[in-house]
Regions:
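Alpha/beta-hydrolase
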Residues: 83, 189, 263-266
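C-terminal catalytic histidine-bearing segment of alpha/beta-hydrolase fold enzymes
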Residues: 243, 247, 254-302
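Primarily recognizes the serine-hydrolase "nucleophile elbow" in alpha/beta-hydrolase
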Residues: 132-200
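Short amphipathic alpha-helix adjacent to the substrate-entry channel of hydrolases
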Residues: 92-112
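Short beta-strand element of the alpha/beta-hydrolase
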Residues: 74-86
């Protein structure tokens, strides 16, 4: 469903985009993420809070690939950089460490970066922080067993937006040592690709401080299709607007979008859980983008 021709009411935008209000069990889900993430950090080999910049928010957590994973002995591991959600104003990298264990076990180096939060900074500032984070990962991945030529970015919700933005980055303009294809692929889960509607959602707009111009400038759907590949997934039980957002990026970027699927039986929050569930379609897409799907087949619809 697309929005009516006349701009809907503020209440309509809040209903479509305020996912915590739409999901009564959101507190239990957030607690599950926190508990599972604490367990992951306790069990995995890790290097935590590594600076990628000078600001205190510019830190990342690194989880090296398991030696028994799907990478040949002595070979460098593909790198998965995962960006947390929270509408650019909430949550922390530590809330989503739980996605790391199955990818580490499969042979990937997993990196979770932090960034500053709105309203202290704007979304454009956050995008540039993540650009610096990815540049750091490219330059230092080998120190942790990672292959800098095989970087994939995943993200949930606002993190899905940031993952798509990183695909569009002109890396050679950032620094001469960075390759044009620094990010080879991205997996966006419940991403936001058109930011204009967020300007009209009272629960969110004051923190984001978007203008019509900045919303368009920061909307992946209105940027040229990148060289890298995108998989865009959304929960089938999400709001009509999130389903529209997912269809929009597929239409805008065309063949660069490998899939723009709705995951059955999942809403905006529990759709992320699938990333950490081996055998799920979402996890299989992650493996395939990393080159770790040994079956080398498109994930099934189930």
């Amino acid at each position: 469903m697309t929005p009516p021709k006349r701009r809907p009411s503020s209440a309509w935008f809040d209903d479509q985009y305020n996912n915590r209000a739409r999901i009564p069990e959101h507190l239990a889900i957030l607690q599950h993420w926190a508990d599972a993430s604490a367990q992951a950090r306790a069990q995995l080999t890790s290097v935590l809070d590594v600076p990628y910049g000078s600001d205190p928010s510019e830190r990342l957590d690194i989880f090296p690939a398991a030696p028994t994973g799907g990478v040949a002995a002595g070979a460098l591991a593909p790198v998965l950089v995962h960006i947390h959600g929270g509408y650019w104003r909430a949550l922390d990298k530590r809330d989503q460490s739980f996605i790391a264990p199955p990818f580490v076990a499969a042979g990937a180096l997993v990196v979770l970066p932090n960034h500053a939060l709105c309203p202290a900074v704007g979304i454009e500032h956050i995008v540039m922080q993540l650009v610096r984070a990815l540049a750091w990962v490219y330059r230092h991945a080998a120190e942790y067993g990672g292959d800098a030529s095989r970087i994939v970015v995943s993200g949930h919700s606002a993190g899905g937006h940031l993952a798509a933005m990183l695909l569009t980055c002109e890396w050679c303009a950032v620094a001469p040592d960075l390759p044009a294809g620094l990010v080879g692929a991205a997996l966006s889960i419940s991403g936001v690709f058109d930011l204009e509607p967020l300007r009209h959602a009272p629960f969110l707009a004051p923190d984001l401080k978007l203008t019509a111009a900045s919303a368009r400038r920061l909307s992946p759907a209105f940027l040229p299709a990148p060289r890298g590949r995108l998989v865009a997934l959304v929960g089938a039980d999400e709001s009509a607007e999130f389903l529209r957002q997912n269809a929009l990026i597929a239409s805008a970027w065309g063949p660069q979008v490998l899939a723009s699927d709705a995951v059955p039986g999942r809403h905006h929050m529990d759709v992320l859980n699938e990333l950490a569930e081996p055998g799920s379609r979402t996890h299989r897409w992650g493996l395939q983008l990393l080159g770790l799907d040994l079956l080398d087949a498109k994930p099934s619809a189930g």
